[in-house]
Amino acid sequence: MVKTLYLMRHGQTVFNLKGKIQGASDSPLTALGVQQANAAQQYFKTKNIHFDYLYSSPQQRARDTLENTVPNQQYWCVKDLKEWGFGLFEGESIELLRAIKQPKYLYGDAVVPFEGESRSEVEQRVNRALYEMMDTTDGETILAVSHGSTIGLFVRNILGYDRGSKFEIGNCNIVKFEYDGEEF
């Protein structure tokens, strides 16, 4: 059976608006972020898309997005869907991180010396979570709400993009994958 995964980034947050790094820290959705989640809800209704299983990063911004997109439905929080841990850079300006990273990396391992996660750690946990999710559910249509960097790493990995290539996903944007039981 082919399954469908809708992978969605959380709505806009206060930190997104202010250009700050979130990572493992959290920031509430803005009014626009709530509107984005409501627009996603309308999109799924218009397309008559119903979900058999719902998953979210445990971070509040992702959970709030899911709860506004698919209200009053049971969902599971999956720890490995959380955002890339940026260590001491969390809460700081994105410009600070851009200043220290090497040009050939998106973030690469630039944050590791500052108590952050390595790229491979994030890739492994996100891939593990999404494959396990698809392998262990008997449903055909799944929605998972996560974060920009984690979704970006997954998409680049699945599509075979070069490690230095850039893939950005906007707030509440959705990517759709088909899963055949072995690969996306």
Task: State the predicted function of each range.
Residues N68, L153-N157:
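Active-site signature of alpha/beta-hydrolase-fold catalytic machinery across serine-
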Residues L5, E140-G148:
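Generic beta-sheet signal
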Residues Y161-F184:
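Domain-level recognition of soluble alpha/beta enzyme cores
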Residues S56-S57, Q124, V145-S146:
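Short beta-strand scaffold positions
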Residues T69-R125:
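Phosphate-handling substructures
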